[in-house]
Amino acid sequence: MRKNNRKLDELRPIRIQRDFNIHAEGSCLVEFGNTRVICTASIAESVPPFLKGKNQGWITAEYSMLPRATATRNMRESVTGKIGGRTHEIQRMIGRAMRAVIDLTKIGERTIWIDCDVIQADGGTRTASIVGAFIAMTDAIIKLNEQKLINSVPIRDTVGAVSVGIVNDRLMLDLDFEEDSNAAVDMTIVATGNGEMVEIHSLGEEATYTRKEFEAMLDLGLESLKQIAELQNVFYEKMPSINLWKRKSVKEAKL
């Protein structure tokens, strides 16, 4: 048994608080257990140089952690003058996940900036960031549509992420920091609400794993992502086949 009597195949308690930031076009606070991330989406009426004149938008992400989001204080990367490799990896993952579920040709020549700021870290910060980023992004795009700046909400599906690992020879879902630190194998799965995979990162930490173990981790993660998609869907009325997404008045959802 794990902390708080959590089962091996059980997600941590998840909570999403929408409109957490009063300024951003879309925002939320997402919590996975003790991990807390503020996600915002901001709209810029411009695109990167490689997209100018192509009548296509872009979505990109930045990720950071507050100095005391962890057990000991870390220097801000802005102070060190260098963005770390882990930060680059995570923010690119967030951006790819968002772009996977939207038709960028239908949002005009504008950029949606996703900012994910970890205020407390206890494992799974990248997965929580992706789950929250989707809510922030979708709300921002719905706002564009409501303002008649675009004529549809071209989002195909929800997208979420979860971690799975092998800890002390046991398969575990949604690892906290202690579990992740002791994992022999660690996997991060990014997938849409209908189970189509966007990205899988799987690696052995000074260990190897079998194809059977890989498939077991993948199955466990994909099954849990159905629950996460259901949580995200609480916030919307949607018919993706006709590019229709509307906000419900829901401000908070829990799992």
From Swiss-Prot:
Molecular function as annotated in GO: 3'-5'-RNA exonuclease activity; tRNA binding; tRNA nucleotidyltransferase activity
E.C. numbers: 2.7.7.56
Entries under Pfam families matching the protein: RNase_PH (PF01138), RNase_PH_C (PF03725)
Highest taxon of the lineage: Bacteria
UniProtKB keywords: Nucleotidyltransferase, RNA-binding, rRNA processing, Transferase, tRNA processing, tRNA-binding
Job of this protein: Phosphorolytic 3'-5' exoribonuclease that plays an important role in tRNA 3'-end maturation. Removes nucleotide residues following the 3'-CCA terminus of tRNAs; can also add nucleotides to the ends of RNA molecules by using nucleoside diphosphates as substrates, but this may not be physiologically important. Probably plays a role in initiation of 16S rRNA degradation (leading to ribosome degradation) during starvation.
Protein name (record): Ribonuclease PH
Organism, scientific name: Hydrogenobaculum sp. (strain Y04AAS1)
Phylogenetic classification of the source organism: Bacteria, Pseudomonadati, Aquificota, Aquificia, Aquificales
GN (gene name): rph
